[in-house]
Swiss-Prot record:
UniProt keyword Flavoprotein present: no
GO CC term (a single one): membrane
Subcellular location: Membrane
Full protein name: Cation/H(+) antiporter 6A
Membrane topology listed for this record: Multi-pass membrane protein
Lineage of source species: Eukaryota, Viridiplantae, Streptophyta, Embryophyta, Tracheophyta
Subcellular location, principal: membrane
Organism from which the protein derives: Arabidopsis thaliana (Mouse-ear cress)
Gene name of the encoded protein: CHX6a
Gene Ontology MF: a single term: antiporter activity
Domain of life assignment: Eukaryota
Tissue expression per record: Preferentially expressed in pollen.
GO biological process, one term: monoatomic cation transport
Keyword tags: Antiport, Ion transport, Membrane, Potassium, Potassium transport, Transmembrane, Transmembrane helix, Transport
Reported function: May operate as a cation/H(+) antiporter.
Length: 818
């Protein structure tokens, strides 16, 4: 095979410990060789040698600094004007800028730095490829490996259709063009375009959602679940094609991959959990384990690349899936490697890849797009056809599953996004000579434009402030009889432990009313420590030490022992700054599909209510943030003790429900009814405040309206509250303004152990007229604020309930439903 001769006259290679043969076709290194120069004046001092940028280390440093400076400058500038684009897009743009700068100064030293005309090893390209493999591994670590098995029907169908329909459409179009016989694109190039434009790569979607800060949302979960389904289909299509086209060799590839997955599941995954159990609670994972995992990740890359001849980074990604995400192992790996990789190494991959794009050629051929001819028109038109099909079918499918039209558009945009995976695979295909450089230029340019404009369009159609809102109902009102109550109890201070356990006891779990309790201990982050999210089911304290959540664990385990047959209990600790605690609460509720979050009230008083013991503004802000963003119903619990009397064998628990018929009151009724499903003797009083009529006296009016109250309550909760139940009392009170409401509530202050009320109860009616303006704590609503106030003469506890706000679609496309 003939060897191409390369002009080496520019380089004084012998000075840098390099050698070349007589015709300059073979380039060798002498080891150990010099990696850096003798100084910037080397040529002037020694009258020979190389410029300092010609040595490997300075050249690498210049490339790293150049790419970092440009992409960070773009990132800061775009953020200043309010345009949020994935960071990898800026890295690609940096490559375009550097590449075109070098092309315009073809004979200058700038061109020699970025495009050295020699056969020396490309250190920067190798390091960039290393960064890409590390990036794929870390993406696997951040992903929940069990997500595909928990994917709901909606995400599975969306993921399936968004791949299959574009694949079919693209294949039919390709066959039509092939029959015409005038195609300038090779068969393999067509197959590659169809495949990569039809799938939605998880890594690209995850990067987009993370950089736009909508990953931890119901919308983000659907998008990631759909992307994961497309990835699984992509693996299936890959191996089907391998077996179909390459017969035995393809079959051996498939077998090798299956064996690899079996080893990951049966050997590596249990080993990861063993590492977690060896790590004491609150302590970092040993460096030995971290670097061993790091080494195995690149061994998996080698196995895929050299043994079964598949896309190498996919091996590191699959291995990353075996690492349990979250604290301590997954979080530690991310904290240790991600920032360095994204800041220094990965930009080399994005920039150096895009530097190979021949932008001048694209501009010269752009006229062919208008004339609808030529190679560029054929590629772009085919890409647009496949992507338009993908966008339309995704939108229709999402809308058919009751997603709002705007969110259906947004989901279609997300699943149509192209980014780091597609660019890497195009580069891989060029190396394997599956596609030609001129086609690569078109595909890379399209990928760049796609990654710029889709995030901008997404900003227009998607509202990120509602990222924790759900598309499905998650509240107590929809729970069927016998269904477990999925709840989250939050503990901020030690005195909240007793209040939350007492409230749980009022539910008294039974066979007809089981509970799945999740306890979250909130610890404020101080100093320079890293945030942590600890699952006490997986991690145990170091022998001889205690956990910072010991009191929480012991107390709630005691509650579980009381009702062990009908209660499951999971305890977590979140250590974070107070400004972000609400995100941990909402994300835990979202990820575990909970129906109720219970938060402690931020103010507590002495037993005689004469002084305020604590008034924590941080806790109040936490409660407000959760109420605004919660994916399910929320209760704020004001603890004032008498609720504990309900556990006494001979006593009745006296509960008062204030029911004015609003959405929050209906949820409060559902919670109250849940408490009545227990075996305990509970006396319930349901009070409703109605407008006073001038045509009849109060007693006659209230007696007539109490019948309607019974019918309303029975219609909401069904047969659980019987019409003639002696333990349920219905009271209608006619009022003309809020002062009468206050007087009535004060008169019954000492008659009950627990008051339950909706946060929106009575708003806009005579019941709250005149007192709404004096509300101190708006999150409780006017009646809840009255019951929780310092002046209210009662020692009864108060539970204020807000029903879930969920996103749905109707014919009028309203964004919220109650």
């Amino acid at each position: 095979m003939a060897t191409e001769e390369i002009d080496m006259s520019y380089w004084d290679v012998s000075w840098g410990e390099f050698n070349e043969d007589k015709n300059s076709s073979i380039f060798c290194e002498s080891h150990p060789h010099i990696v850096n120069s003798h100084g910037i004046w080397e040529v002037m001092t020694f009258k020979r040698g190389m410029n300092f940028w010609e040595y490997p280390l300075p050249n690498l440093e210049i490339l790293i600094f150049s790419t970092f400076f440009i992409w960070r400058l773009l990132d800061i500038s775009f953020n200043k004007i309010g345009l949020r684009v994935p960071r990898f897009t800026y890295m690609m743009i940096a490559g375009i800028i550097l590449g075109q700068t070098c092309h315009f100064s073809n004979k200058s030293w700038i061109h020699d730095i970025f495009f050295p005309d020699d056969n020396r090893p490309k250190v920067a390209e190798t390091l960039g490829a290393f960064g890409f493999v590390l990036y794929w591994f870390l993406k696997g670590v951040t992903m929940d490996a069990e997500l595909p098995f928990r994917t709901e029907k909606r995400s599975s169908v969306i993921g399936f259709i968004t791949v299959i329909i574009p694949l079919i459409c693209g294949s039919l179009t390709f066959r039509y063009r092939e029959r015409r016989g005038d195609s300038s694109i090779l068969r393999m190039e067509y197959r590659l375009i169809i495949f990569l434009q039809s799938i939605s790569a998880f890594t690209s979607i995850d990067t987009l959602l993370k950089d736009l800060q909508i990953k931890h949302s119901e919308f983000g979960r659907i998008a990631l679940s759909g992307a994961m389904v497309t990835d699984m289909l992509a693996f299936g299509v890959t191996f089907f094609n391998a077996i179909y086209y390459e017969k035995l060799y393809g079959f051996m590839q498939t077998v090798g991959f299956c064996l690899f997955v079996v080893v990951m599941i049966c050997v590596v995954r249990p080993a990861m959990y063993w590492v977690i159990k060896q790590t004491p609670e609150g302590r970092p994972v040993k460096d030995f384990y971290l670097y061993s995992i790091f080494g195995i990740a690149f061994a998996c890359f080698t196995f895929f690349n050299k043994v079964i001849h598949l896309f190498g980074p996919a091996g590191s990604f699959v291995f990353g899936l075996t690492v349990p995400n979250g604290y301590p192992l997954g979080t530690t790996l991310i904290q240790k490697f991600e920032s360095f990789n994204l800041g220094s190494i990965l930009p080399l991959f994005g920039s150096l890849t895009m530097m190979q794009v021949d932008l001048l050629r694209l501009f010269k051929e752009s006229g062919d797009l208008i004339r609808m001819e030529g190679q560029i028109y054929e590629v772009i038109s085919f890409i647009l056809l496949v992507n338009t099909t993908k966008f339309v079918v995704t939108t229709i499918t999402a809308y058919a599953f009751k997603m709002p039209l705007r969110d259906s558009f947004a989901l279609a945009l997300v699943l149509s996004n192209k980014g780091i995976f597609e660019l890497a695979y195009y580069t891989y295909a060029v190396e394997l000579k599956l596609i030609r450089p001129e086609v690569f230029t078109i595909l890379a340019a399209y990928t760049l434009l796609n990654s710029i404009f889709i995030p901008m369009l997404l900003e227009l159609v998607h509202d990120p402030t509602k990222r924790f809102r759900c598309y499905r109902k998650r509240n107590l009102g929809i729970l069927k009889d016998g269904a477990a109550l999925q709840c989250l109890m939050c503990v901020y201070r030690p005195d909240h432990i007793t209040s939350m356990t007492d409230l749980l006891e009022t539910f008294s779990p039974s066979q007809d009313s089981p509970m799945a309790c999740n306890i979250l201990h909130l610890v404020e982050l101080v100093g320079q420590a890293n945030p942590m999210f600890i699952s006490h089911q997986l991690q145990k304290p170091e022998p001889g030490s205690t956990s910072l959540s010991d009191n929480v664990i012991i107390s709630f385990r005691g509650f579980q022992r009381q009702f062990f047959e009908y209660t499951s209990l999971d305890i977590f600790t979140s250590v974070s700054v107070s400004q972000h605690m609400h995100e941990d609460i909402c994300w835990l509720a979202l990820s575990r599909s909970l129906s109720l979050i219970v938060l402690p009230f931020h103010r507590t008083w002495s037993v005689d209510r004469s002084t305020v013991i604590s008034n924590d503004d941080n806790l109040r802000m936490l409660n407000v943030n959760v109420l605004r963003r919660a994916p399910c119903s929320v209760g704020i619990f004001v603890y004032r003790k008498p609720i504990v009397e309900s556990h006494m064998a001979k006593s009745h628990s006296k509960i008062c429900l204030i029911f004015n018929g609003g959405k929050d009151d209906r949820e409060a009724l559902a919670i109250t009814n849940r408490m009545r499903l227990t075996e305990k003797r509970t006396r319930l009083t349901i009070i409703r405040f109605i407008p006073k009529s001038s045509e009849m006296d109060n007693d006659e009016w209230e007696q007539q309206q109490s019948i309607n109250l019974k019918e309303s309550v029975t219609s909401i909760v069904g047969s659980n509250i019987k019409e003639n139940d002696a333990k349920v009392t219905y009271i209608d009170k006619a009022v003309s303004d809020g002062s009468e409401t206050s007087r009535i509530l004060r008169a019954m202050a000492n008659d009950y152990d627990l008051f339950i009320v909706g946060s929106g109860s009575g708003i806009g009616t005579e019941a709250t007229s005149g007192i709404s303006e004096w509300t101190e704590f708006n999150e409780l609503g006017p009646i809840g604020d009255l019951l929780a106030s310092h002046e209210y003469p009662s020692s009864a506890s108060v539970l204020v309930v807000q029903k879930q706000v969920y996103i749905h679609h109707t014919k009028s496309q309203r964004r919220k439903s109650f």
